[in-house]
Amino acid sequence: MQKVFNMHDLVKFSPETLKYNEAGLVPCIAQDVESGEILMMAWMNAESVAKTLETGRVTYWSRSRQSFWIKGESSGHVQELVELRVDCDRDALLAMVRQTGPACHTNRRSCFYTAIRDGEEHEIMTPIS
């Protein structure tokens, strides 16, 4: 039988309740809320999770720059947060977003543009012109 939730079942969310890796990061998958397409994966720390929830603009942690990365801040290809979901182990996030323009830095709609078929790589998506 399916459990029915009521207002008393709601729990206040805190980024500190997530399980971060040894670098203090958690993976976050971005998914287009309208098409269901998987757009990208990037990392978040507790502060970037909090910033994302506060601003509604998806904010990642750049491991290479060691700084916050507000998606689309320089390119204009923003990700507007619709809903943030936590997986069952609390060690991964799913950001349901409205994506403006391409999500990938290669100018493709998705970062997942290479398929492996019969042991060979196939480019299945071209850059947006």
UniProtKB/Swiss-Prot annotation:
GO biological process: one example: L-histidine biosynthetic process
Any single Gene Ontology cellular-component annotation: cytoplasm
Residues annotated for Zn(2+) binding in this entry: C88, C104, C111
Pathway as given in its UniProt record: Amino-acid biosynthesis; L-histidine biosynthesis; L-histidine from 5-phospho-alpha-D-ribose 1-diphosphate: step 3/9
Domain of life: Bacteria
Chief location: cytoplasm
Cofactor(s) the record lists: Mg(2+); Zn(2+)
Protein function: Catalyzes the hydrolysis of the adenine ring of phosphoribosyl-AMP.
UniProt cross-references to PANTHER family, sorted A to Z: HISTIDINE BIOSYNTHESIS BIFUNCTIONAL PROTEIN, HISTIDINE BIOSYNTHESIS BIFUNCTIONAL PROTEIN HIS7
Protein family according to the UniProt entry: Belongs to the PRA-CH family.
Subunit structure: Homodimer.
NCBIfam families named in the record: PRK00051.1
Protein name: Phosphoribosyl-AMP cyclohydrolase
Protein's organism: Ruegeria sp. (strain TM1040)
